[in-house]
A protein has these predicted regions:
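Short, small-residue-biased leader/transition segments that mark boundaries at the very start
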Residues: 1-6
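Pair of pore-lining "gating" transmembrane helices in MFS-fold secondary transporters
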Residues: 8-37, 41
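Substrate-agnostic recognition of the 12-TM MFS/MFS-like secondary transporter fold
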Residues: 41-47, 53, 120-169
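Interfacial helix-start motif at the membrane-water boundary
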Residues: 48-65
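Hydrophobic/small/kink-forming positions within alpha-helical transmembrane segments
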Residues: 65, 69-73
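Helix-to-loop junctions at the C-terminal end of transmembrane segments
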Residues: 72-87
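Cytoplasmic-side transmembrane-helix entry/capping segments in multi-pass membrane proteins
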Residues: 87-96, 116-119, 140-143
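C-terminal ends and interior cores of transmembrane alpha-helices
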Residues: 99-113
Length: 169
C-alpha cells in the first residue's frame, strides 16, 4: 500500500495538468472558441458579446460558466456523500466521472459544441475542486496563472533567504 495519498503522486499531478491544458486547447480550437477551463476568458468574452448585443454568441460563453458552477457543486456533494467510505475515495469517483464525460465529448459532432463545452467545463470544475494541493502545496491542475505566480514567489523567496525548503515547493 502506498504511504501517501494517491492524489499526491507526481504522475497523477502531471497527467491532470496536461489534461487541463489540452481541454482548453481542444475546446477553444476545435469546439467554437470557448474555454473549458479558463472561465475568466469566458467571462470576458461573455461581457464583450453582451456589450456588442451578440446575445446568441454570449450564450455560448454563459453555458460553460454555469456548467463550471454546477461541476463544483457536484464535486462537493460527492465529497460529502463519500467522506465515510472506506472502499473508495471521492476523488476517484470524480476522476471516473471526468473520464466518462471527456470520452463522450469526443464522440459529439461539431454541431454539438455547446453541450460538449458545457460537459468539459463541468468536468474541469470537478477536477479543480478535487485536486487543490500537491504534497500539501496549493496548486491548480487546470489553470497555470496561479501556479506561475506561486512558483515565481517561491523562487524569489528562495533567492532572498536561501531557504532550501523553498526550492522543493
Amino acid at each position: 500500500f502506498p504511504t501517501r495519498r494517491s492524489s499526491d503522486l507526481m504522475p497523477l499531478a502531471i497527467f491532470l495538468t496536461l489534461a487541463g491544458g489540452l481541454q482548453d486547447a481542444y475546446s477553444y480550437n476545435c469546439r467554437g472558441k470557448v474555454f473549458a477551463n479558463a472561465q475568466t476568458g469566458n467571462i470576458v468574452l461573455l461581457g464583450q458579446n453582451l456589450a456588442e448585443g451578440n446575445w446568441g454568441v454570449a450564450l455560448h460563453y454563459l453555458i460553460p460558466l454555469l456548467a463550471f458552477i454546477s461541476g463544483v457543486y457536484v464535486a462537493v456533494r460527492i465529497q460529502n456523500l463519500c467522506k465515510e467510505s472506506e472502499k473508495i475515495h471521492w476523488r476517484q469517483i470524480v476522476l471516473v466521472i471526468q473520464i466518462i464525460l471527456l470520452f463522450l465529448v469526443g464522440l459529439f459532432p461539431q454541431s454539438m459544441n455547446v453541450p460538449a463545452n458545457a460537459m468539459m467545463s463541468f468536468s474541469c470544475a470537478m477536477q479543480v475542486n478535487a485536486f487543490r494541493k500537491f504534497h500539501g502545496i496549493p496548486c491548480a491542475t487546470t489553470m497555470c496563472i496561479g501556479n506561475m505566480r506561486s512558483a515565481t514567489e517561491m523562487l524569489c523567496k528562495y533567492q532572498v533567504t536561501g531557504n532550501q525548503e523553498l526550492k522543493k515547493k
